[in-house]
């Protein structure tokens, strides 16, 4: 696959800095990529040369207990292909997903992160008319807002940056909250007539935000810890609050092939607005600069143009 674009994920930055667990070096990073098929093996039947595709760089074994239970996203014996910060990669047929040639390859490159968002939001089991709270209005949070709305939720979004809160409004958040200016819990209760959020996605890797989000939940509420916390921090949650309100605390990690296909369909059909999330488009030789931009949380999505 000759690659056109590859987005930079915060995980790439952690791995680049040597902070991601389970990584063997040297390692070519990048896993949010789109391109075109240039060569195929003799046994390949599902794709053809010239076809526009997105790539899933994690190859699940398909035979471990997790895979056999349908939890391919947490495969116990995954292998990692060569990353997307490259001009071309070789991947198994099962790990490429064709997309509509009318779809921008920049938009298609959002398939992997959107597939993870879809999985997290699906685990929250949002019902039409419920209130969903999204903590963090970076690129991932902005996709959570859109998916929660697609599931029929009224969305509240919280972030410390006014420009990100404005983007959250543009993506469909009905209420935006700056926790630096007001109590998160009080703001959520005020926006829900004292009921609280039926579902919440914590898209920022912060123990404090996990702790502060739990009390915003309504009875029967669900919280998805979407982001890993690095360096690791202990989290203190009130077990009585979880017990008496029948709360559910959930984690989600990566995505399954089914999530991948659904995310790509949302992009192909224009139901997920991802192009407005690109704030920086850089050539490959400025990859290190792009990593620093993501590390500093400047702008939104930093994407590498592999032909610039």
Model-found features: residue ranges?
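Residues in the short beta-alpha loop(s) of Rossmann-like NAD(P)-binding domains
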Residues: 19, 161, 229, 255
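Glycine-rich cofactor phosphate-binding loops and adjacent beta1-alpha1 units
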Residues: 124, 166, 171-247
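C-terminal hydrophobic helical "lid"/dimerization subdomain
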Residues: 211-215, 257-308
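Mid-domain Rossmann-like dinucleotide-binding core that forms the NAD(H)/NADP(H) cofactor-binding site
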Residues: 103-182
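Glycine-rich beta-strand-centered segment in the early N-terminal region that forms part
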Residues: 1-6, 19-65, 100-103
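NAD(P)H dinucleotide-binding glycine-rich loop of Rossmann-like/cofactor-binding domains
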Residues: 59-135
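Glycine-centered, small-residue-biased loops immediately flanking beta-strands
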Residues: 130, 221-222, 300
């Amino acid at each position: 696959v000759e690659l056109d674009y590859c987005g930079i994920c915060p995980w790439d930055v952690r791995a680049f800095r040597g902070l991601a667990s389970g990584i063997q070096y040297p390692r070519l990073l990048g896993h949010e990529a789109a391109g075109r098929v240039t060569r195929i093996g003799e046994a390949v039947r599902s794709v053809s040369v010239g076809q526009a595709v997105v790539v899933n760089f994690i190859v699940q074994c398909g035979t471990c207990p997790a895979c056999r239970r349908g939890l391919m996203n947490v495969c116990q014996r995954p292998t990692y292909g060569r990353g997307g910060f490259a001009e071309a990669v070789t991947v198994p047929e099962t790990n490429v997903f064709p997309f509509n040639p009318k779809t921008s390859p920049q938009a298609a490159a959002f398939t992997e992160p959107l597939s993870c968002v879809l999985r997290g939001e699906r685990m929250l089991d949002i019902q039409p008319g419920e209130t969903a709270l999204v903590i963090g209005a970076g690129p991932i949070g902005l996709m959570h807002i859109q998916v929660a709305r697609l599931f029929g939720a009224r969305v509240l979004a919280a972030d410390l940056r006014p420009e990100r809160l404005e983007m959250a409004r543009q993506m469909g958040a009905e209420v935006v909250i700056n926790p630096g200016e007001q109590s998160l819990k009080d703001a959520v209760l005020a926006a829900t007539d004292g009921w609280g959020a039926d579902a919440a996605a914590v898209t920022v890797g912060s123990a404090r935000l996990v702790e502060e989000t739990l009390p915003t939940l309504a009875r029967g509420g669900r919280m998805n810890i979407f982001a890993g916390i690095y360096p690791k921090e202990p989290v203190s949650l009130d077990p009585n609050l979880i017990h008496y309100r029948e709360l559910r605390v959930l984690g989600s990690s990566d995505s399954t092939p089914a999530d991948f296909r659904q995310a790509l369909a949302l992009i192909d059909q224009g139901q997920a607005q991802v192009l407005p999330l690109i704030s920086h488009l850089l050539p490959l030789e400025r990859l290190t600069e792009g990593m620093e931009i993501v590390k500093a949380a400047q702008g939104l999505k930093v994407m590498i143009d592999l032909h610039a």
